[in-house]
Amino acid sequence: MQSYDIAQFIDHTALTAEKTEQDILDLCNEAIEHNFFSVCINSGYIPLARQKLQNTNVKICTVVGFPLGANLSTVKAFEAKEAIKAGATEIDMVINIGWIKSNQWESVKADIQAVLAACEGALLKVILETCLLTKEEIITACKICRELGVGFVKTSTGFNKGGATVENIALMRQVVGENIGVKASGGVRDTKTAIEMIKNGATRIGSSSGIAIINGLTDNNAIY
C-alpha cells in the first residue's frame, strides 16, 4: 500500500480543547498537502475549516455528543443539524453508553435514529467506545447500526481508557458486513498499526498522527 492510498483512509483529527485557530488552519493545510480524506474537528471550528478547504477535496467531519454520549437525543440531533448547516459533511456521534449498560436498547436505537434523521444526506458514524463495552454489547450495538443503515461504526472517542484494537475492528466488520464502514480511532499513531486495522476491516482511520502514518510508509518503502 502506497502513502497516497492510505491517505484516503485518514480523518486528520484535532479534537482536544486547547486547539487554536492556527492549529486548525495547520491541520487543514496538512490535509490538503497529504490528500487526507477529511479533517475531524470540533463544530465551533467548522466555519474556519470550510473557508480554508473550499475548492479542495478534503471533507469536514465533526463530532456530536462528544465525548460522553450522554446528551439528550434532541440535543445531539440539533448539534448535528447545525454542524451540517455550517459545512460538515460527516458526523461522528457518540452512542449512549449508559443506556447500553442499562440494557435500554430501544433507547439506544432511538438516539441513533434521531441523529440519523437530522443528518439530511451527511454521513453518520456511530462511536461505540468499545473499551467500555463487552463483546456482546459491541455485537448488539453493531447490529442496531446495521439495521438503521448508518454510514460507519467507529471504535472510540480517543478520550477514554482505550482505543481501537485489531480484535474489535475484526468483530465490528464481521457483524456489520460489507455495506457499512468501520472506523478505527484512538491509539492509531503509526503505519504498522494503521495497516493492521485496514487489513482487519477498517475503511477509515481517525488519527492526529496522519503525517507520521504517511511518513512511515514513505520511509519504509511501503513494506508493511
Swiss-Prot record:
Q: What positions does UniProt annotate as the active site of this protein? A: 92, 154, 183
List the coiled-coil residues: none
Indicate yes or no for the key word Nucleotidyltransferase.
no
What Pfam families does the entry give?
A: DeoC
Into which EC class is this enzyme placed? lyase
Record keywords, A-Z:
Cytoplasm, Lyase, Schiff base
Q: Which GO terms describe its biological process?
A: 2-deoxyribose 1-phosphate catabolic process; carbohydrate catabolic process; deoxyribonucleotide catabolic process
Q: Its pathway?
A: Carbohydrate degradation; 2-deoxy-D-ribose 1-phosphate degradation; D-glyceraldehyde 3-phosphate and acetaldehyde from 2-deoxy-alpha-D-ribose 1-phosphate: step 2/2
Q: Which reaction does it catalyse?
A: 2-deoxy-D-ribose 5-phosphate = D-glyceraldehyde 3-phosphate + acetaldehyde
Q: Listed GO cellular component terms?
A: cytoplasm
A GO molecular-function term, please?
Answer: deoxyribose-phosphate aldolase activity
- Localisation per UniProt entry: Cytoplasm
| Function per UniProt | Catalyzes a reversible aldol reaction between acetaldehyde and D-glyceraldehyde 3-phosphate to generate 2-deoxy-D-ribose 5-phosphate.
Recorded family membership? Belongs to the DeoC/FbaB aldolase family. DeoC type 1 subfamily.
Q: Which HAMAP family match?
A: DeoC_type1
- Protein name in the entry: Deoxyribose-phosphate aldolase
Q: Which gene encodes it?
A: deoC
